């Protein structure tokens, strides 16, 4: 919680108004879900770390059951801690629960109300969602298979060249999770980001070192996940503070400054795409394709926010810009975080890793790389990926929903306007659904018959994990993320013996403790902090195949009119 002196002074002014709301809430007809006792007016604001609430939310879930409530100032939060409760409210009753509790700083100021992630459930969100789904739906996402294939081959080559660099050199993560450009994390990030940049802008990320564009993408995403965390700013807990003048509202200038930073980067990518389209030199990314269709409809110039009021609902320039941002965020962050967690968990569980190698050798062998058709034939690897996403979900509390009307669940009132959180962390740590939940056990999901049930499946009650959310707000990038993780992780297992740094005193592997929350970053999205890993080809034959494949890929880039890799 960030509270300035001005905010503390202003707090005195608004306590009376907040008291009225407090009294109104206390006299409702039906009981609220149980929860921890809070302070008058301020509620539970200071009873947990608002930047990392999921550990405390798990404790409260274990104490209060499937549903509990907390109060952050004037903001009522209902937390759903079982798959049954989350499925019933967020999926079955999605008509009531499909809106968002939009963070004032993160949505109104930083995003100028144009970021689809936090848009209220309404016309503009539906327009943006329709366009995103046209790119990331189950059918269209398969068209990205070639890009994922080629970019994953580049990543293998980068890891081959990287070797032990992350072990032999000293790297320090920045205060906001900034990753050094020569660390192996940056190699993975280049892969995931280049895939979605191709999809959105028709351009590659073809360089790692000395490439500020790659690192700016993650800098902006990290900043957004921090400023959008519920409770991060007092103004989110006490909305009446929004009426304060600028001199008493330092968050306002901060949010506007962050918006300018975003537009300097994302806005420039849009402008560059627009210029390339107008000059006839643009490639067929989402932005260029949309501008082409809009121009053909007679709307070449359409500045501003939102969409046109006619039935066609053409997106204006800033909504296109932020819809493109949504696709980049949906397709890159989850995938890279999943790869980092997978490597950490597999190294922490060497028996599972060895079994994955044995399966790979039996199914694929050393004469070729694994490919898409191998997915059904690698059930243990698939189980390891699923268990990774269960044990280390990238967003432990998902993205908060908002209920549009009073509702009742199991005799408890869910008041209109409440923030409603699907507590993914508590569901994934449920010992009934997942016995011994803190253990890494891929056998939970192992199906040797090859019949897979990914989290993107239609049956909400029998999904393997819940990292992609619920209902109408189900993550648009789920199909792209699952495919990107499979192809790159299968090839990582096939091509490399990867290993942790050794303790010079004991000779044992030095790995972060996956059970320690400090192993992970905080904010809306949590990823492992950087840790050292070495990569060694499993044989000289594997190494030569990786090198030859990389050379072939450069020819592919050239034939596609794309930038070749610079190393």
UniProtKB/Swiss-Prot annotation:
The protein's Enzyme Commission number: 1.-.-.-
Domain of life of the source: Eukaryota
One GO molecular-function entry: monooxygenase activity
CDD domains on file: CYP64-like
Chain residues that bind heme: 475
Location relative to the cell: Membrane
Keywords: Glycoprotein, Heme, Iron, Membrane, Metal-binding, Monooxygenase, Oxidoreductase, Transmembrane, Transmembrane helix
Primary localisation category: membrane
Entry GO terms, CC: membrane
Residues of the signal peptide: none
Cofactor: heme
Pathway annotation from the record: Secondary metabolite biosynthesis
Glycosylation sites: 25, 81, 223, 279
Transmembrane segments: 7-24
Membrane topology qualifier: Single-pass membrane protein
PANTHER family with a match to the protein in the record: CYTOCHROME P450 MONOOXYGENASE ALNH-RELATED, P450, PUTATIVE (EUROFUNG)-RELATED-RELATED
Role played: Cytochrome P450 monooxygenase that is able to use 4-ethoxybenzoic acid as a substrate for oxidation.
Family assignment from sequence similarity: Belongs to the cytochrome P450 family.
Protein name per Swiss-Prot or TrEMBL: Cytochrome P450 monooxygenase 69
Organism: Postia placenta (strain ATCC 44394 / Madison 698-R) (Brown rot fungus)
Taxonomic lineage: Eukaryota, Fungi, Dikarya, Basidiomycota, Agaricomycotina
